[in-house]
């Protein structure tokens, strides 16, 4: 679980990430699709998987919006993300291990875009948050 310090670190980090969420999200999604090509299977319905394509641009908005929403639900991620977990488990049928892959790609991109605002202790807090987020999104798979 997240400590009060972790929550504070994530809120501060998100305040800096949020204005650049579109850029960070697009880069992270494009990076995931390139570095982990097996993830493309979940986006086969998209005509173009290149980083600047319309579907990728839309996807990054959805993903980064969901992360921003989760930042407001620290104390009840399971309840707050239940419907999103259900969607990914039942309809989209995304392998839950991919949540961790995407979180890793987002973390890498954050470090590139905001190096001075992402020291190791903040990185650790954001990583814990993403781990909790992945667990919450994977809850309906059980």
Swiss-Prot record:
This is Hemoglobin subunit alpha. Heme b binds at residue 88. One of its GO terms (molecular function) is heme binding. PANTHER family: ALPHA GLOBIN-LIKE-RELATED, HEMOGLOBIN FAMILY MEMBER. It comes from the Eukaryota. GO terms for biological process: hydrogen peroxide catabolic process. Heterotetramer of two alpha chains and two beta chains. Keywords: Acetylation, Heme, Iron, Metal-binding, Oxygen transport, Transport. Red blood cells.
